[in-house]
Amino acid sequence: MSLAAPLTAADLWADVLAVRAQSPLVHSITNFVVMNFNANVLLALGAAPVMAHAHDEVADMAGIAQALVLNIGTLEPAWVESMHKARRAARARGIPVVLDPVGAGATAYRNRALSGLLAAGAPTVIRGNGSEVLSVAGLGAPTRGVDSTLSSNDAVAAAQTLSRRIGSVVCVSGADDHVVDALGRWATLSNGHPWMTRITGVGCSATAMIGAFAAVQPDAWRATTAAMAYLGVVGEWAAEQVIAAGNGVGSLQVKLLDGLQLLDDATFRARLKMTVHG
C-alpha cells in the first residue's frame, strides 16, 4: 500500500478473509499463562497455531511456519535461546517476526533478554502496552508486572521514535490502540471493552493475531491495523452480548472466541472506529 492510499474497513475485512482462507501456520514461542488461549484464538480466527519451544526443533518449525511470534512473558534461559534459534531461521526465510515485550522494564533479567532479541535484528512488528513500549524505546516507564501504568495515548510519540529508529511497525495497545511505522503512518483504533483487560492473555493473543495477519498481508502496518481492529470490534461485540445476558468475564472469554470465528462483514464495518492520521 502506498503512503497516499487510504486504508478502509473493506481493506481490513479483506485481510480477515485472507486469514480464514489461507489458514497460515503461526509458530509461537509464548508464555505458559496464555499458551492455550492464544492457540484457541488463532484457531477461531482461522489460522493454525503451533507452540514449540524445544531447542532441537524450533529452527525446523520456523522453517515451515508463515510467521513467528516471540513472547517474553514467562522467561527462562532455555526459552530465550530457542527464541534466538527460531528468529535466525525466520530471518533466513524472510517470514514476519512479531515481538511481544511482556513486562519490559520490570526486571534486569527481562531487560537483558529483550535487549538481546532486539540486538539480533529489528522484528517486523512490536506490540506492547504503553509502559512496555516506552521501556523498549529506552525512555523508561513505571511498570507493575505485565500491567501498564500509563495510557496508550501517552506512548504514541515513543512508538513513533522507536519505529523510525529500528524500522519495525510498533503497536501500542490500550483503551485506544495505535499502530505506527517508519514511513510516518499512524492508525488509531478505538473499539474494545474494559472487560477485555480482566481476561488474561488478550494482549498476548493480539500479538499472535498480528502474526497471522502479517503472514497473509505483506504490508506489516496494514496487517497490524487489521488484527487490532478485528480484535477490538469482536471484543466490544462479545462484551455487549455477555452483559446483556447477565453474565461475566468467564463467559466473555468464550464469546470472544465465538466472535473471532463468526463475526460478519456488516457488523465489522458498522462498528469499526478507526482514524488514520495525516
UniProtKB/Swiss-Prot annotation:
Its cofactor is Mg(2+). ATP binds at R127, S173. Pathway: Cofactor biosynthesis; thiamine diphosphate biosynthesis; 4-methyl-5-(2-phosphoethyl)-thiazole from 5-(2-hydroxyethyl)-4-methylthiazole: step 1/1. HAMAP family: Thz_kinase. GO terms for biological process: thiamine biosynthetic process; thiamine diphosphate biosynthetic process. Keywords: ATP-binding, Kinase, Magnesium, Metal-binding, Nucleotide-binding, Thiamine biosynthesis, Transferase. Catalyzes the phosphorylation of the hydroxyl group of 4-methyl-5-beta-hydroxyethylthiazole (THZ). It comes from Leptothrix cholodnii (strain ATCC 51168 / LMG 8142 / SP-6) (Leptothrix discophora (strain SP-6)). It is an enzyme of class 2 (transferase). One of its GO terms (molecular function) is ATP binding. Substrate binds at M51, G201. Belongs to the Thz kinase family. This is Hydroxyethylthiazole kinase. It catalyses: 5-(2-hydroxyethyl)-4-methylthiazole + ATP = 4-methyl-5-(2-phosphooxyethyl)-thiazole + ADP + H(+). Its EC number is 2.7.1.50.
